[in-house]
Amino acid sequence: MGKNLRIKTGNRAPLLAQGETSRALSDLEEGSNVQPENVGFCRVIKLARHDAGKLVIATMALLVASLSNILVPKYGGKIIDIVSRDVRRPEDKAQALDDVTGTILYIVIIVVTGSVCTALRAWLFNSASERVVARLRKDLFSHLVNQEIAFFDVTRTGELLSRLSEDTQIIKNAATTNLSEALRNITTTSIGLGFMFATSWKLTLLALVIVPVISIAVRKFGRFLRELSHQTQAAAAVASSIAEESFGAIRTVRSFAQESHEVLRYGEKVDETLKLGLKQAKVVGMFSGGLNAASTLSVVIVVIYGANLTINGYMTTGSLTSFILYSLTVGSSVSALSGLYTTVMKASGASRRVFQLLDRVSSMANSGDRCPTNENDGEVELDDVWFAYPSRPSHMILKGITLKLTPGSKVALVGPSGGGKTTIANLIERFYDPLKGRILLNGVPLPEISHQFLHRKVSIVSQEPVLFNCSIEENIAYGLEGKASSADVENAAKMANAHNFICSFPDQYKTVVGERGIRLSGGQKQRVAIARALLMNPRVLLLDEATSALDAESEYLVQDAMDSLMKGRTVLVIAHRLSTVKSADTVAVISDGQIVESGTHDELLSRDGIYTALVKRQLQGPRFEGTSNATAEIEPISNGQ
């Protein structure tokens, strides 16, 4: 009796004090309060290192374009000096016209060259920016999809989507496009200042008096805007989470007529984002206005002093004109830099959120590389396993579970909802690691086994299987990464009693099932999921029987498919049907995280214990009146524990 099961009993003490558990999980609980080690702008720039060659060419083109922008005022000033000459004699007039024509020709050459270089610079920087955002999104998605399941238990999907799309876009602009503009304006400013000093060092020093004041203001403004931008992006991510949640549960929303509630809930978060955005707009507006006023005042003072120098003969009219044009060009570049600084501060807030995720280290140990196969292939053992979900560390779900499944055996788990049945299946799949104890496959602890090998050997069919928004064929072959032939897929579908309904569709195996398989019925989804598991040909099967209402024919087809799936495999089934329990080699009753009874169906009934009470309560309950013993449910749908 119960040969496939070992039980340890006795008093169980809490494995970890509540404070210790909480500290171990602080990165999950604190969320955005955990700061990445390095979010400096240099790290953002490093994202474009793969395009360094193209960016060097773009930078050279940028320098030429910036120089051309400054040379135009220089030759414009020459034209002023030429037309200011005394040209009363015909030969002087002819010479002046020749000089003007030659100067204009120089200006045309400069403008054409600058335009070509500007186009080249824009093309190279923009193409690099697209590659940067693609690379960043791939890296971020790859990092996220390899995080432990506990991370997704406490992190909203909408927030992750916001970081993948919106935040990466902001960083892209900062890393390339805005960098291009910043370099252009810095170069233009530097060259312009050089020409200004060459024209009149006195006027230049006067123009630069205001620079220290502006620098201090920009620094303080940048710090404030960076934090405000971070808060705005965080609020937008929460709004995205609500929208994603509402769309994903739209049938539940509709069935409870809660559309207006969801609209209100989303609107409240959007209003929070709007409030922060308006505050940000106000601050940016005040800063831009103040900067513009300071720059304009500086130009006015320079013009007044320059006019005085010209009147007194220290400058020519052309030189003053060139200087004014230089100062306007430099002022325009500085103003553009202030706008780019605003964007960079926003990118700093976004990069903090993205790099926080990229720097996050999974709390689960890395998988090993062992691929254990022996004469006991398919043996699973849980040895004194204690476990609490990271999102609820103070609530111990499993308390010293010891359970052994011999190859080819069938063990059924029954018991009250919340007892820990589904948690046992989750741990065997290594969705989580136990806090204490070991789980072994073929005698090897799960952390030492190759991730790919483990999930080729172990498959799970849950109560509500999840299908992807692709064809039925792609869903069935999902675990084999497209390496399954059409014949293999069709054979698996036949074994799962899915072939006939698939062939009834116009596109047959090419039929797209919709998001989460929404275009298929419950029974059809379950049979496709069974076919997917059959194609993987696992040695260990974790089966959570569906308790959702199916019509008699669908229930028969699903049950028949499950029987085919279980043949010749080690099976751990979370049982809800009496027929499944009767056919099990061992039945384990799970209550409050412990195995309280075990044995065969008949042995447990003869003991007149908890199992007997469960069966009697279910068979005598009003919801099962008229239900035969063969199909009666042992336990209502569990709550995922």
Curated annotation (Swiss-Prot):
Q: Per its UniProt record, what Pfam families does this chain match? A: ABC_membrane, ABC_tran
Q: Does the keyword Membrane apply?
A: yes
Q: What happens when the gene is disrupted?
A: No visible phenotype under normal growth conditions, but mutant plants are hypersensitive to aluminum.
Which keywords are on file for this protein?
ATP-binding, Membrane, Nucleotide-binding, Transmembrane, Transmembrane helix, Transport, Vacuole
InterPro entries the UniProt entry points to: AAA+_ATPase, ABC1_TM_dom, ABC1_TM_sf, ABC_transporter-like_ATP-bd, ABC_transporter-like_CS, P-loop_NTPase, Type_1_exporter
Disulfide bridge partners, by residue number: none
Kindly state the tissue distribution recorded for this protein. Expressed in primary roots ans lateral roots.
A single BP term in Gene Ontology: response to aluminum ion
Principal location: membrane
Its annotated compartments are:
Vacuole membrane
The superkingdom listed in its UniProt entry is: Eukaryota
Q: Note the topology in the membrane.
A: Multi-pass membrane protein
Induction summary: Induced by aluminum in roots.
Where does the ABC transporter domain lie?
380-617
Q: Which Gene Ontology terms cover its molecular function? A: ABC-type transporter activity; aluminum ion transmembrane transporter activity; ATP binding; ATP hydrolysis activity; ATPase-coupled transmembrane transporter activity
One GO cellular component term? membrane
Q: Which residues form the ABC transmembrane type-1 domain?
A: 55-346
What family classification does the UniProt entry report for this protein? Belongs to the ABC transporter superfamily. ABCB family. Multidrug resistance exporter (TC 3.A.1.201) subfamily.
Q: Return the PANTHER family for the record.
A: ATP-BINDING CASSETTE SUB-FAMILY B MEMBER 10, MITOCHONDRIAL (PTHR43394:SF1), ATP-DEPENDENT PERMEASE MDL1, MITOCHONDRIAL (PTHR43394)
Protein's name according to its UniProt entry = ABC transporter B family member 25
Give the species.
Answer: Oryza sativa subsp. japonica
Q: Gene that codes for this?
A: ABCB25
